[in-house]
Amino acid sequence: MFEKMTIEDCLSKESDLINLSLERIKCIDSAVKSFITVVDKQEELEGPYKGIPIAIKDNITTKNIRTTCGSKMLENYTPPYDATCVKRLKNYGFAIVGKTNLDEFAMGSSTERSAFFVTRNPWDLDYVAGGSSGGSAAAVASGEVVAALGSDTGGSVRQPAAFCGIVGFKPTYGLVSRYGLVAFASSLDQIGPMTKSVRDAALIMEVIAGKDPMDSTTVSKKLDFLTHIEDGISGMKFAVPEEVYKYEQLDREVSDRFEEALKTAEKLGAKVSRVKIPTIKYAVATYYIIAPAEASSNLARYDGVKYGLRIEEPGLMDTYMKTRNVGFGEEVRRRIFLGTFTLSAAYYEAYFGKAQKVRKLLSDDLNRVLADFDAILTPTSPSPAFKIGSVADPLTYYLMDIFTIPANLSGLPAISVPFGFAKNLPVGLQIMGRRFDDPKVLAIARAFEKYSPYNINGRIPLPVVRI
């Protein structure tokens, strides 16, 4: 069945995978709502992955394919160029069958903040798919595509992957070019693969990673993501932050699955130890000063002059104000206000300056722990997916990224791999490693995937979407 196929499965099939993908989208996407744009006409591409259908989050530019960022501001914007990661996928023959839904400008944790519609969780259509890469996660989990790209600023690849029961990988900052990724918070943003297996995530990393002259933050480091992926975890040492157990909102069933994962690690020959990471409790507050500050600067370009929405008013200032008020949704406006406030002369040092210092302290703490351990383990999210419309308080919403944010603030690689269920919805295990230790992080995730008691015939189960 196409919906269960991985990239490796596709390599041994002669069938028309693109049409199978488009038929699957046509059949179920009216219910799941993964896609903002579906691409029916494909380019003639050659390469080792020719014809394997993949989806792209709709804040990553695609030449001659609409790129909306889930916003009214860019609803009709069609870029004249491909993002570097998209160009590299095309060079290897991958077929882009659509652009996936997201929280507006990638600001959110549920895809409820899209200006167009809410993406639904394939495991239960009454629940969110997570965010901000919820469309990509749902498209992969429901079998509409074999794999997808997402972007991760504070957990936006890993959290929806956990909610939808798939693999989501955030690489080390600088490994994957951000050229063509519409900027939210430039020092935090990173593009990553969302797949049905850890090996597929490694395969995509082999394609998209690498130095790019169009992005000065990329590095020249050449990593081998596949050779050691089956090495296992025997003899490794894993750290578990004590702060995980002190978090009162940690769901009991999520905690139980996490304990099972730790026992699995020990059975496979790894040693698990608790450690103190005192600055981790400041991660969310630090993030919600730095990220909105960068967003307020990055989103200043959307003024109705060069491209995007323009609401004409008699005066230029009125045109700016009306355009931004209509074009941006409530959550985006909230973060712009917050960021502009923290960057103001009167409050810069008290908020933004202090947050940057705490960011450095947190990064130092994580690197100190990782000097003695192979990886840090946490749940990906403190809870499974929640019902659509059930969370209204912004603070509750922001705290859902409490375990994922530290990897972005420190630039470290981190992956979410499925590990069981809570309340009949998927749970993710997060593995965070040293900078540029991405291959080891993938190998650790592969061991958990391979030996998970929740595997079925060696595969992580996927949902049966009932329409």
Swiss-Prot record:
It is an enzyme of class 6 (ligase). Transmembrane segments: none annotated. It comes from Pseudothermotoga lettingae (strain ATCC BAA-301 / DSM 14385 / NBRC 107922 / TMO). Belongs to the amidase family. GatA subfamily. This is Glutamyl-tRNA(Gln) amidotransferase subunit A. Keywords: ATP-binding, Ligase, Nucleotide-binding, Protein biosynthesis. Its EC number is 6.3.5.7. It catalyses: L-glutamyl-tRNA(Gln) + L-glutamine + ATP + H2O = L-glutaminyl-tRNA(Gln) + L-glutamate + ADP + phosphate + H(+). GO terms for cellular component: glutamyl-tRNA(Gln) amidotransferase complex. It comes from the Bacteria. The keyword Membrane does not apply. Allows the formation of correctly charged Gln-tRNA(Gln) through the transamidation of misacylated Glu-tRNA(Gln) in organisms which lack glutaminyl-tRNA synthetase. The reaction takes place in the presence of glutamine and ATP through an activated gamma-phospho-Glu-tRNA(Gln). It holds the Pfam family Amidase. The active site is at K57, S132, S156. Coiled coil: none annotated.
